[in-house]
Regions:
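Specific transmembrane alpha-helix
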Residues: 50-63, 125-137, 163-194, 228-250, ...
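Membrane-cytosol interface segments of multi-pass membrane proteins
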Residues: 1-154, 176, 288-345
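Alpha-helical transmembrane segments and terminal signal-anchor/GPI-anchor hydrophobic tails
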Residues: 194-260, 275, 280-284, 291, ...
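Membrane-interface helix-boundary signature
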Residues: 1-11, 39-42, 74, 167, ...
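Membrane-interface helix-boundary motifs at transmembrane edges
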Residues: 2-5, 65-75, 135-146, 187-199, ...
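Aromatic-anchored segments of alpha-helical transmembrane domains
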Residues: 17-24, 87-89, 151-164, 205-218, ...
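Alpha-helical membrane-inserting segments
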Residues: 86, 90-94, 98, 135, ...
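Interfacial loop-to-helix transition and helix-capping segments at the boundaries
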Residues: 38-50, 113-127, 161-179, 213-238, ...
Length: 345
């Protein structure tokens, strides 16, 4: 199936909501604004949110990696590199002025200088995605796809088994490259698989995913390593089937359309939401023990997520009206053929 597949945008919408929810918990639990059980709950979705994001990115990159290097730069890489650099500077400048509500080490000059080769903040996804596109282009037509997938699977298993570089970016590259390549190489079989799965199969995938998470939690590192990719694929299959069924079922289309809208604007949310979460957390922290906020602790990450996503979109829409601010989310015309940047590639 060629052309745009709307439910893939819906899947990206699901993924970005889970990413924001994870970061909302990351800010609100340590500061006493949210219930502690949000930390293990967010860990449950670890094998869904980023694998889903990267697999869909791979599915949408099939045409891009077949283009020439200059075309790949203009249509995909330029916006990733530009936005990564711009927001790295913005985040560093922000945390030079505003204290961090939690210790993310975002104001370190050493980390800032090294960020072009060793990012250590939430923008690592952009760095990794650009690297994945370069790697996929370099491998295209030169390395057998099954060999590439086998190597990427082993790397992911090793990383999920406990191996670490001590850096979120390098660890993420090891863990998630396999999902990007699976999306890239198996786009059509994945689409056919999803199109044949209705609601009963979607629910069954959720049950299998939940059972697998419980079993993994009761085992050691070897089982964690060996099952990471298979369980991640079950989770991704659930996310894709959920998005597809929401889109094709009449009474759930009201949910799928906002998800698809959001999925086409993931870049704006991804780069903006952390600063908003940080700001809102800092504002609320002095009142963490008040009666109202104590009552809201069980749902605070959800409330934060429901707030920062639309605010991120509003900020981006406002910036779109001002030429110089438009460059916060799009590469300058001299570096890119497209003024792309609405959605992560």
């Amino acid at each position: 199936m060629s052309g745009r597949v709307p439910w893939l945008d819906g899947a990206r919408g699901i993924a970005i909501i889970l990413v924001v929810l994870f970061h909302a918990g990351m800010f609100t639990v340590p500061t006493g604004l949210a219930s502690p059980w949000w930390e293990p709950l967010n860990l449950v979705f670890a094998l869904l949110r980023m694998p889903l994001f990267f697999l869909v990115a791979g599915m949408l990159a099939v045409g891009a990696v077949q283009r020439s290097w200059p075309a790949l730069w203009r249509t995909r890489l330029a916006v990733l590199v530009w936005v990564f650099l711009v927001w790295t500077v913005l985040r560093f400048a922000y945390y030079q002025v505003v204290p961090e509500p939690i210790d993310l080490n975002q104001s370190s000059w050493t980390d800032f200088v090294l960020s072009v080769v060793r990012p250590s903040n939430g923008l690592w996804f952009l760095f990794a995605l650009a690297l994945f596109l370069v790697a996929a282009k370099a491998l295209h037509g030169r390395v057998n796809r099954w060999v590439a997938l086998a190597i990427a699977t082993v790397a992911s298993s090793v990383a999920h088994g406990g191996f670490t570089f001590g850096n979120v970016t390098y660890d993420g590259i090891m863990k998630y490259f396999v999902f990007f390549m699976l999306g890239l190489y198996l786009r059509e079989p994945i689409i056919r698989f999803v199109h044949r799965r209705r609601w009963p199969a979607t629910v069954a995938l959720l049950v299998v995913f939940a059972a697998a998470i419980v079993l993994r939690g009761a085992t050691g590192w070897f089982v964690d390593a060996a099952t990471a990719v298979p369980v991640g694929l079950i989770a991704v299959a659930f996310g894709l089937c959920l998005s597809r069924n929401l889109a094709r079922t009449p009474f759930t289309r009201l949910l799928s359309r906002p998800l698809e809208y959001l999925g086409r604007r993931t870049l704006q949310v991804y780069v903006t939401h952390i600063l908003l979460l940080s700001t809102f957390t800092s504002v609320l922290m002095p009142f963490a023990d008040t009666a109202v906020l104590t009552m809201l602790r069980p749902v605070m990450p959800v409330l934060m997520t429901a707030t920062v996503i639309p605010v991120s979109l509003l900020i981006a829409a406002g910036c779109e009206r001002v030429p110089v601010l438009r460059l916060l989310y799009a590469a300058p015309t001299w570096s890119s053929r497209e003024r792309a940047g609405a959605a992560l590639p």
